[in-house]
Each structure stands twice: as C-alpha cells, then as structure tokens.
UniProtKB/Swiss-Prot annotation:
Gene: murC
Its biological purpose: Cell wall formation.
EC number: 6.3.2.8
Keyword terms: ATP-binding, Cell cycle, Cell division, Cell shape, Cell wall biogenesis/degradation, Cytoplasm, Ligase, Nucleotide-binding, Peptidoglycan synthesis
Major localisation: cytoplasm
Pathway in which this enzyme or protein is active: Cell wall biogenesis; peptidoglycan biosynthesis
Membrane-spanning segments: none
A Pfam family annotated for this UniProt entry: Mur_ligase
Subcellular localization(s) per the UniProt record: Cytoplasm
Keyword Transmembrane carried by entry: no
GO molecular function: ATP binding; UDP-N-acetylmuramate-L-alanine ligase activity
The name this protein goes by in its record: UDP-N-acetylmuramate--L-alanine ligase
Example of a GO biological process term: cell division
Length: 460
C-alpha cells in the first residue's frame, strides 16, 4: 500500500514497538502533524511518557485488542512474525507497512532527501549535518537514531524541502527510501543474522546507491575499499572524502587535551577553511568530512559549516560525558561492534587519565557469535574490561555463545577481564577498583548505561 503524509491525516496509525528510537520519532512526526497515533511496546520508558504527553495512546504489552480501531499498522524489521498485533492486522486486512516503507512514503514529499548509511557513525554524522543545516537556516526535517539536544529529541519538523535521516541496511530497510543525496560512511560485517556475508551486504549498499537519481549525489569514504568500488560504479554525481586521495580531505591534523581534532579542510588542492571539532576521536574527523560534503552540495556558507561543527555536541550515548564522582570520569558510548569499540577506546587514549575501565555489554547472541574473534581483538586499549551478560534484544539464548566464553578468550589474549552478571555486581567491582583520575566507560547498545548512572549516584 501507499501512504500520503498530506492527504491521509484522518487515519489512525498504530506503531508496534513504538518505544524504539526510530519508531518514536516517526510517531512524534505524525502527532505533530495532527494524526491520531497509538502504539505498543513491551516495557515502560521515558520515550513512551513523552509520547503520551503528546497525545498518543500507549499500551504496555502486545495484544490484538490494541489495534481494533486503527487504519494503518506500522512495524519494525525486529518484530517477529508471531506478534499478536501483526497476526491480527493480517487476518483482518488492516493496512500494514514496515517502518522503512513508511519513512520512505514521508520522504516522497521532500525534494532534497539526505539518507546517511553505513555500519558505523550514522547518528553522529546526522547530528553534525543537523547542526550545520540549522545554522544555515535550511529548516530541515530531521529523523535521527539518537537524542540530540539541539532539536530536543530524535526528530524535528521543518517546513522546507530538506529532509535528513539515517538509513539502516538491516533487512535492506534503506532500499525503501528516496535519496537525493546518499552517504555511505563505511561497510562492515554486521547484521549477520540476516545477511549471508560481507559480499551480500556490499551488494545491498550498491543497490542503495542505485536509488539516487542521475542529478543526485553519492558521498562516500574513499578509505573503505568497498565504498570506493561503489563510488566508481555510481550513475549519479559523486563526492569522496578521506585523509588522502579524495575530493574532500582533512590535513594538518592535531588533537587537543580533550581528544578533539583541529584540521584544515581541502577540496582537491584548494584549502576551504580550518576548524576544531567538539566531538573527540579520529573517527569523528571522517564523520565531519561526510557532513561537509553534503553541505558543499547545498552551497552552505563556510562560516555556517564551521560554526555547526565546532558547536556540535553530538548525540546522546556517543562518547557522552555523564559526570564525575570521586575523581572518576564516567562516559557512555553506544559502540556494540568491534570496529566501534576500537574507535571508542582509541578516543579515550587521547584524554589524560590513569586507567581505563571498560564495562562492556555484548548486544545480541548472533553478533557475539559471528564476530567472536573480532571481539577478542577489540579491547587491547582498555586497562580492565568488566564484561556483562549478553543483552538479548530481539533474540533468544541458543546456548551457542555466552559472555563467559568471551571472557575466557579475552583473558587468554592477556586482557584483564572480569565477568559480572548484573548491574549491581558491576557497580560493586568498580567501587572497589576505580581510583581518582581513572576513566569509566560504559559501552554497548543495551542497558549498560545503568552501571555508570548507579556509579555516579553512589552515596546520594
């Protein structure tokens, strides 16, 4: 079916899994546009409370009773086929649309759609580009997979033709989009519960590039060989970025005491400007370059680019400073893939401190199993790893892999690693181990952040 964002405002739309960061953003867009919205999720959250206050009917738990008076049901790729609401909608011919198709239909109403894809960095790049376009008064609509202070959440309703969103490759979701500008930050082995291998993933990114019209643009990181190949085959305009041999490059790079980079931005051999980022880490130089490329396509003033990037605080859970207690600094990061973990720990090295305690919570059994060897090589920059049980998310424990297995493998490679089985057990270990001027990182896409929050609240 199709959905017309302008003409279908008399419809009531129900979201299965409305508490998710992307689904809640879509629901909020509809609520702000006058739609009747309902949704269900398996547990209460701050996101659900906000949606209630905005007028949504929220149900805790999934039941066919929740959708008896709705016109359209939207669901995510993570919703299982045996979900009672999904079954009822199919049996009773209620219109169904997955999240990606629904977002794609909303995008149809905009001319300058920017879809930011890649295994890592999507939210940060979207955050940077959001800052720039807001500084430039482009008045974009924004949907992002994280909370941004500058827009007060994970969405913004604009009144222009500019639409900025993340584009996830999971279950080929981004193939439902209509990009005018497509960004490929990187390609990596992930979501192997769905894809056969990295070659199939790369093929899907190539299909994403093919969605861009001939007068549109594909932007990609030249240092990733798979992205480089897709750029070379693109039928649309292309713009590459990287540290060398790219259209847009960063040169003369230095880092300050907070781990934030200063560098000169060049297009070919012409220096455009210099800037200092407020987001730490070498990987954020690349994220910044990707957002600069988009900005150049839209002829954004250099001063707005510089201001947008220098003031960008990034999204929550992206190397997010949470606080300090007893001289121990606590930082939370969403990293859940070995490449991301390495980047996070590398960033931490640029900040003056004594020991780094990395509290890591593996995310899904499939990812832990398929990338097991890569995980065992991801923690060498941590002084100590506190390893929590695997966060199941959408999966069930098959008994094929556990955090204990990962702990054994890490210790065999010389990593100091302690397995814990609850937030409180992790907290007690850290209270007895962390000392003034140490750095405590909570790392993962589950609920590991609770450990850091409890650590900061000790004694209160």
């Amino acid at each position: 079916m199709s959905f017309d964002f302008i003409k279908d405002r008399d419809k009531k739309v129900h979201f299965i899994g409305i508490g998710g960061i992307s689904m809640s953003g879509l629901a909020a867009v509809l609520l702000n546009s006058g739609y009747k919205v309902s949704g269900s999720d398996f547990k209460e959250s701050e996101i659900l409370k906000k949606l209630r206050l905005s007028g949504a009917d929220i149900y805790i738990g999934h039941s066919e009773k929740n959708i008896k008076d709705v016109d359209l049901v939207v669901y995510t790729a993570a919703i299982p086929e045996n979900n009672p609401e999904l079954i009822y909608a199919k049996e009773n011919n209620i219109d169904l649309m997955n999240r990606a198709e629904f977002l794609g239909n909303i995008m149809k109403g905009h001319k300058y759609n920017v879809a930011i894809s890649g295994a890592h960095g999507k939210t940060t790049c979207t955050s940077m580009l959001s800052n720039i376009t807001l500084k430039a008064n482009l008045d974009p609509t924004i949907l992002v997979g994280g909370e941004l202070d500058i827009i007060g959440g994970n969405f913004r309703i604009g009144s222009s033709d500019y639409f900025i969103t993340e584009a996830c490759e999971y279950k080929r979701s981004f193939l439902s989009f209509f990009p005018y500008v497509g960004v490929i930050l990187n390609i990596d082995a992930d979501h192997l519960d769905y894809y056969k291998d990295i070659d199939e993933i790369t093929e899907t990114f190539g299909q994403f590039a093919d969605l861009i019209p001939n007068d549109g643009y594909l932007i990609g990181y030249i240092g990733d060989s798979r992205v480089k190949e897709i750029l070379s085959k693109a039928k649309c305009n292309t713009l590459s970025y990287g540290f060398e041999n790219a259209d847009v490059t960063a040169r003369n790079i230095t880092f300050n005491e907070k781990g934030c980079a200063s560098f000169d931005v060049y297009k070919h051999n012409d220096k455009l400007f210099d800037l200092t980022l407020s987001n730490p880490g070498e990987h954020n130089i690349l994220n910044a370059l990707s957002s600069i490329c988009v900005s150049l396509i839209f002829d954004v003033n250099y001063d707005d680019i510089i201001c947008g990037l220098s003031e960008c605080k990034g999204a929550h859970k992206r190397f997010e400073y949470k606080g300090e207690v007893n001289g121990v600094t606590v930082i939370d990061d969403y990293a859940h893939h070995p490449v991301e973990i390495k980047a996070t720990l590398n960033t931490s090295k640029k900040i003056p401190h004594n020991k780094t305690f990395c509290v890591f919570q593996p995310h899904t059994y499939t990812r832990t199993k398929t990338l097991f060897d890569e995980f065992t090589d991801a923690f060498f920059d941590a002084d100590e790893v506190v390893l929590m049980d695997i966060y199941a998310a959408r999966e069930k424990d098959t008994g094929l892999v556990s955090s204990n297995d990962l702990g054994v493998a890490l210790r065999a490679k010389g990593v100091k690693c302690t397995n814990v089985h609850s937030h409180d057990e992790a907290l007690e270990y850290l209270k007895n181990s962390a000392k003034p001027n140490d750095l405590l990182l909570t790392v993962g896409a589950g609920d590991v952040v609770i450990v850091g929050e409890k650590y900061l609240n000790q004694g209160k």
